[in-house]
Amino acid sequence: MEKNVRFKMHKVKKRWVTLSVASATMLASALGASVASADTDTASDDSNQTVVTGDQTTNNQATDQTSIAATATSEQSASTDAATDQASAAEQTQGTTASTDTAAQTTTNANEAKWVPTENENQGFTDEMLAEAKNVATAESDSIPSDLAKMSNVKQVDGKYYYYDQDGNVKKNFAVSVGDKIYYFDETGAYKDTSKVDADKSSSAVSQNATIFAANNRAYSTSAKNFEAVDNYLTADSWYRPKSILKDGKTWTESGKDDFRPLLMAWWPDTETKRNYVNYMNKVVGIDKTYTAETSQADLTAAAELVQARIEQKITSENNTKWLREAISAFVKTQPQWNGESEKPYDDHLQNGALLFDNQTDLTPDTQSNYRLLNRTPTNQTGSLDSRFTYNPNDPLGGYDFLLANDVDNSNPVVQAEQLNWLHYLLNFGSIYANDADANFDSIRVDAEDNVDADQLQISSDYLKAAYGIDKNNKNANNHVSIVEAWSDNDTPYLHDDGDNLMNMDNKFRLSMLWSLAKPTDVRSGLNPLIHNSLVDREVDDREVETVPSYSFARAHDSEVQDIIRDIIKAEINPNSFGYSFTQEEIDQAFKIYNEDLKKSDKKYTHYNVPLSYTLLLTNKGSIPRVYYGDMFTDDGQYMANKTVNYDAIESLLKARMKYVAGGQAMQNYQIGNGEILTSVRYGKGALKQSDKGDATTRTSGVGVVMGNQPNFSLDGKVVALNMGAAHANQEYRALMVSTKDGVATYATDADASKAGLVKRTDENGYLYFLNDDLKGVANPQVSGFLQVWVPVGAADDQDIRVAASDTASTDGKSLHQDAAMDSRVMFEGFSNFQSFATKEEEYTNVVIANNVDKFVSWGITDFEMAPQYVSSTDGQFQDSVIQNGYAFTDRYDLGMSKANKYGTADQLVKAIKALHAKGLKVMADWVPDQMYTFPKQEVVTVTRTDKFGKPIAGSQINHSLYVTDTKSSGDDYQAKYGGAFLDELKEKYPELFTKKQMSTGQAIDPSVKIKQWSAKYFNGSNILGRGADYVLSDQVSNKYFNVASDTLFLPSSLLGKVVESGIRYDGKGYIYNSSATGDQVKASFITEAGNLYYFGKDGYMVTGAQTINGANYFFLENGTALRNTIYTDAQGNSHYYANDGKRYENENGYQQFGNDWRYFKDGNMAVGLTTVDGNVQYFDKDGVQAKDKIIVTRDGKVRYFDQHNGNAVTNTFIADKTGHWYYLGKDGVAVTGAQTVGKQKLYFEANGQQVKGDFVTSDEGKLYFYDVDSGDMWTDTFIEDKAGNWFYLGKDGAAVTGAQTIRGQKLYFKANGQQVKGDIVKGTDGKIRYYDAKSGEQVFNKTVKAADGKTYVIGNDGVAVDPSVVKGQTFKDASGALRFYNLKGQLVTGSGWYETANHDWVYIQSGKALTGEQTINGQHLYFKKDGHQVKGQLVTGTDGKVRYYDANSGDQAFNKSVTVNGKTYYFGNDGTAQTAGNPKGQTFKDGSDIRFYSMEGQLVTGSGWYSNAQGQWLYVKNGKVLTGLQTVGSQRVYFDENGIQAKGKAVRTSDGKIRYFDENSGSMITNQWKEVNGRYYYFGNDGARIYRGWN
């Protein structure tokens, strides 16, 4: 087709419309058709067209027997009468006229039956109108960029205009009012001109071709058999039988019964879809042409006709329509109303979004329900929050209903009965399928309990009690231990109160292992949670039975595996991936990264410290450990084919558990060395307490664990002592497992450990010691920290300390008891989600299990948890159906009977269970009551788009809308065979199960209906399927859905032969819209066209601006499009939010959730910025999103923090930001600034609110302060140095002092800025110059100095600089620090000799320098002070602390004589130092290197013996000399200090560096015993030296 198009603009009410004025010539040669003309004009009066518009629920359009009246026909003239008869019948039935038919009936010759393209002429506007429109539009268009350029927030980038907010971010979906104009910025943020209306200006006259096509494309009849529909509703994928087929694209021929064509070949819901269809199909059929929004309706219709002709040609050449079905299906998926675009948002559900099925609906009555009680978790089972439980704002209901796929309505009593039926089938599978009870499952794992009605817990518990008597005794209970996957903290107490019939996980302990051990070092927590953050506090666990039973695990098939794979795919493979929807290829790539990461010491994704986690799991008391397959074998790869790096460690622990792990438990965590450690001890079988002695088995059982989570850990010489219990005194222990620099070394036998030198012996109190070299941190693929596990030497090879369960009747009302027998169990989660598909029979999981039972036995496995054995769905909608792990199924009775599932066939399952039973293992089935995946049959259901809680998504296009779901099973599957099949039998055997009223409904289960075929009425809802909001077709005007049922018949008029040209048109007065369903002008109706929402008022014309419609507020731009998902800021600065349906959020909306975000609305305004709600200050950003757990700086520069839960401004508390800066929020919630007193702390905060730590602050008064680097406290009374090396002194008030100061006896000086003066002079206010030492800063006296100005100054005795001539007879220090002397004549002495000073003292000058200190001159021992003046008649304490005396006349030092000074008598010995003062009785004194002693009688002791001094302390004198140090006196080893005083009752470090302790009574050194010293116990060995540090 060749087409020339001219575009014109016409101004209508200040809006501009693009008019397309086109002429088209379609060449007949394009189709090889001969050219013929129609002699008779077709009628164009719409009023004469056949229009059918019956009420959808009451009126009929036609009966099955009535054909639609023809408007044109290709039949031969012989068919005319028949057509006339049909028309007449149609008139009678529908009460309408068909004048067009009569006209059409005159064109019956063969040539006229062929399709011939005609030229379309556009009419309706004068040249003057078009010219004016063009000129004005050009001027208007040119002015727009200049207007935008004037806006300060708008910037042009790559030719487009963007609006930037105050933070520099581009605003999207945003409209702003500026003056009298409104500017709109679309979803990309780019400005979009909304002043133009795209409307069709062509003539509304109907072409002859359009009439012919309409006549032949009408439905063959309105009988439902002529339509492909879902529950009689037409969909975008519907096909129908037209009246005629344009055979080979040339000749209209009556259709046959199999000649179905796509509905979209003849009808489209709007112009945009029609244009998209033409453009899409042009490519399919080989037409090189693209149509735009400016294309007229007439040209678009002609293009669609050409596409239809080409389609028919290709059908003829291909001889099938398979290709067409594929093309149409693919096209449908491209249209937003028929794909996920109209189902958004995608952030509130694991599968992007949820659909809630309406309970009451006239449109789909077969899908109604009286139940669908959502979120009836243990926390909310009755519909009200259980008062027993603590409210958790992060998990308000303890779970939610919509998890995955088709969500089973577990509140429906009929469904509840079916769940019981299925449970019975599952547990009796061997008996039912193979007539072999030995192949029955023993127990179940309840999947995703927090996502189903908690009544299922009651039903399953009651069945287990009735069928197995688990409440009768522990033996029965332990043979049928069923577990629950329930993550809420409320679930375990719920199960406990219900009788502990089912066992829940210890999720707290899982989290403790995750954060203490498995995470990278920079985010790891301490080790203390491993003791206390658990269902069992293990600091001291000497209980016979724990309060609640539980099982524990580190990882699982769906925990800490698929999350990591998801993260890898998102980060490194497909950044556009969402949630858990990824392909097998992406999974395979991710596992290459995952497996390599597992082998690294520095991991990016996988878990650290797996051996440490398993050490705790497999040695802890009070919970059944569950080992995960993927920790021993790679998650991917064939089953059990590839061991992980942690396999040997876990296997070693498993085998040791059977042999050693028993008894009470004690755990400790404390700081030691440069880090912290965790210790755990099990005392052995028969010893619950540390003091229990037990028996022989006790002595050969038990285990000790020491671990840490810091790879740089060192004991730093400290000792760790493990109290292994009284039963293990003086016993050898050997290593079972030790971390090394390369990994983890394991030792299977005593001999292996002995050979490695890893054997220790406990002391007589049962302590096992670890010294400095024993415990060192390492970093390798297995351990990031350190690990040691020790067990007793001497256990028999076949020792098994496990305990059998008792058959004594239970009397406490509980079924499961976590006692020693329960502790003896080990679960094995025997599969991975991601294991590879078998390539041959021997690779199937169940085959491999049967062949490896002995291995599981050797590990001590007691309960084998099988993978879910259901044949998987392959719909690929979610990870589970991609990897086919068994959790995505459509027939839950099919355990590999119809075909092999991922794990094998039903027969292989039977063999695996029997093999496990043969070795005494119990086998657990996976019971998955929550969801079912894509069924083979579809239904139309009335649905509402909701979040995972079932709360409607505000503004969603899916609101009580019809939607096609995959919710109906085949009716000929195993569900049909076994569904409800056992209910009668169960009711007879266990009648109590059918009379007990369930908590959520108050009703008993209902066995009266046997569910043989699943359908929507049994489901709560489903996930969104990407079919779009309008996939079930409807009339936009009446909102009626097209339906082909005889009693609710409603079809588009196009299918009844009427020519319908829909879309927006300009009629010379305004903009109107013709319905795509009827062709009539729309009035008082919303219309969606090209994804835009319009409203046409009561007069039929398009509205603009703010409008209130049916009580709701909307805003329509100049081009008539409604604001949707858009924030509009009006001229007053108020923000309004228009939802996806165009409605403005109003006051009654209050808080509204948008995905994970919240907004607040009042009086039609959206909260932006600081807002007070119910008395609480909250903050909403520029887009209205509430700030939670965020620090916000508001426009006034103030800092606030808003609570992570309620969003309220936090007050009177400290907070820290992500960079480590701290703030204090005052009583008004604003971060304080400046100096503040908080509690007893004096703190300072910058102007931005950040607390000052480790830095100086200058106050407004100019005072300098310093604040501590850790606490932020203001420093007082202390010196501090800044980064530049300047020193300051902070006074009592914290301010840096200035001027002259005397601090701690030092005379110092500080500048006006607080800096201390060092190495420089200061001119005081008295005009005098002083100098302060360069190192100490102390004022200098009697010294010559060189100041910073380069000048030399002589500082006198008073510290003031003087003229040298005034220092006669004085000493002083010169600039080099040497002490010089001016004689009494004022002359500087440069020689040597004695000189008298001005105060009549004497100095001795040697080579010009005055001597100081001890000197020997001419045989005399003399002493000179620091200023060089000789000491006479005075005592001098030397640098060695000893006292000497110098004669008052000669100055000679006194030797071997007594001297009385100031009334005290001193004796100076051989070395000239004072020995004693005053009364010498009972005193020692130094005589050179010897110590001597005066007895209490005052006699100098010269012999040997024990003596008591004046203080009652004991000494020993030997040959006149007092003994010191470690000595042997008689038979005693004793110790005397440096003064000769005997040590008693104290620990002493002796000369060999060792610490010894001496008895408090005898003073004898103790050996080979513990002793408490300063509150801590130490062990002292055979030589008396301390060996170990023990406990506090």
Curated annotation (Swiss-Prot):
Residues covered by region (Catalytic): 200-1044
Region (Disordered): 39-119
Entry's Gene Ontology cellular component terms: extracellular region
Top-level EC class as recorded in UniProt: transferase
Reactions accelerated catalytically: [(1->6)-alpha-D-glucosyl](n) + sucrose = [(1->6)-alpha-D-glucosyl](n+1) + D-fructose
InterPro entries tied to this protein: Cell_wall/Cho-bd_repeat, Glucan-bd_rpt, Glyco_hydro70cat, Glycoside_hydrolase_SF, KxYKxGKxW
GO terms classed as biological process: glucan biosynthetic process
Record Pfam families: Choline_bind_1, Choline_bind_3, Glyco_hydro_70, KxYKxGKxW_sig
Region annotated Glucan-binding, chain positions: 1093-1592
Family that this chain belongs to: Belongs to the glycosyl hydrolase 70 family.
Additional note from the record: GTF-I synthesizes water-insoluble glucans (alpha 1,3-linked glucose and some 1,6 linkages), GTF-S synthesizes water-soluble glucans (alpha 1,6-glucose). GTF-SI synthesizes both forms of glucans.
Name of this chain's protein: Glucosyltransferase-I
Lineage: Bacteria, Bacillati, Bacillota, Bacilli, Lactobacillales
